[in-house]
Amino acid sequence: MVSSTWGYDPRAGAGDLVITTTAAGAVTIAVLLFQTVCGDCGPPPDIPNARPILGRHSKFAEQSKVAYSCNNGFKQVPDKSNIVVCLENGQWSSHETFCEKSCDTPERLSFASLKKEYFNMNFFPVGTIVEYECRPGFRKQPSLSGKSTCLEDLVWSPVAQFCKKKSCPNPKDLDNGHINIPTGILFGSEINFSCNPGYRLVGITSILCTIIGNTVDWDDEFPVCTEIFCPDPPKINNGIMRGESDSYKYSQVVIYSCDKGFILFGNSTIYCTVSKSDVGQWSSPPPQCIEESKVPIKKPVVNVPSTGIPSTPQKPTTESVPNPGDQPTPQKPSTVKVPATQHEPDTTTRTSTDKGESNSGGDRYIYGFVAVIAMIDSLIIVKTLWTILSPNRRSDFQGKERKDVSK
């Protein structure tokens, strides 16, 4: 008896015809089916140190291609493919290990760069040596090496600073100014300029040491300091000016004075100075000369206190009061000392073109006022005496005298 079945024998290829005979002599004919759907290679193969880039694909028809990327810590070996292809027989193309351990891209240095032969390299297995060269603006120190090696722990050996900055030419002196050099004159340094008082900076305030061709130099021309002048000082009416010249430099002085019969108002001396915008200007406006007769004179001010304690004694005033109705009899006169009114010192300032002239009007006013005050004080004293010697006091005084006479 002969029977036929469809099945799969892992020892045979897909589509092979397999004939088997049982112990009873039956013959079985089997046509093996494909392990996968015809034209589908199935999942991509595993490759050491790499992983396939599948995206959303799950089926791979004939001639499909799958690329791989290296795992962390591994780099693709140059000249080795990272792609497999689905063949007509449903198998993936042969492949080899193309990811190996490698150092990362060599360190970028501020003073040096990799030589051109290393620009396109991305695979640096252990033991790889790379070499640097100085960047523009730097010069190599012969005693130091510019090489670095990929070590066993996949790090690069340190590189000595074998390049030093080039120096720009020494700056020339700045006439009537100052050059500030904060960090030297090496490549990348900046210097600043300023002028002395009375001078203006013409040009830029700072320049930079930079690359010019194959060397380094200052990136601009040096400035200059030019002297600042003031305009001619203004003339004044009824006066003269001393210190005139053809030009007026910083801090130069002119002096004004008035003609006879005129008084100067303002600053008699002005000097040439500089504004914030470096423009010459005079320190103040010129003075004015005004005719003496037109100058207003301030009246003197006298400070008279309302009350005060007399301090300067005057000649005593003597007064005898007679007894009414009786013959006058000799009596011992009563003497009352009347102090003079306090006189404040005259503090009024008097100004005159003639030093010998005095303010007679003001003095007469003061003396008259003092006399009035003295007269008022005298009247008060008389009133006081009259009160003391009233009729009652006089009666007592007369009775006492009669008693003395009878004795």
Swiss-Prot record:
GO biological process, one term: negative regulation of complement activation
Any Pfam family hit: Sushi
Residue ranges constituting the Sushi domain according to the UniProt record: 40-101, 102-165, 166-227, 228-291
Gene3D superfamilies in UniProt: Complement Module, domain 1 (2.10.70.10)
Renumbered residue ranges of the record's region Disordered: 301-361
Main subcellular location of this protein, as a coarse class: membrane
Biased composition (Polar residues): 306-324
Record keyword Glycoprotein present: yes
Cytoplasmic side: 390-407
Glycosylation sites (chain numbering): N192, N267
Keywords: Complement pathway, Disulfide bond, Glycoprotein, Immunity, Innate immunity, Membrane, Repeat, Signal, Sushi, Transmembrane, Transmembrane helix
One cellular component (GO) term of this entry: membrane
The name this protein goes by in its record: Complement decay-accelerating factor transmembrane isoform
Sequence similarity: Belongs to the receptors of complement activation (RCA) family.
Biased composition (Basic and acidic residues): 343-357
Membrane topology value: Single-pass type I membrane protein
Annotated compartments: Membrane
Parts of the chain that traverse the membrane: 369-389
Role: This protein recognizes C4b and C3b fragments that condense with cell-surface hydroxyl or amino groups when nascent C4b and C3b are locally generated during C4 and c3 activation. Interaction of daf with cell-associated C4b and C3b polypeptides interferes with their ability to catalyze the conversion of C2 and factor B to enzymatically active C2a and Bb and thereby prevents the formation of C4b2a and C3bBb, the amplification convertases of the complement cascade.
SMART domains: CCP
Signal peptide range: 1-39
Disulfide bonding pattern of the chain: C41-C86, C70-C99, C103-C150, C134-C163, C168-C209, C195-C225, C230-C272, C258-C289
Domain commentary: The first Sushi domain (SCR1) is not necessary for function. SCR2 and SCR4 provide the proper conformation for the active site on SCR3.
InterPro entries linked to this entry: Compl-Cell_Adhes-Reg, Sushi/SCR/CCP_sf, Sushi_SCR_CCP_dom
Extracellular side: 40-368
Tissue: Testis, spleen and lymph node.
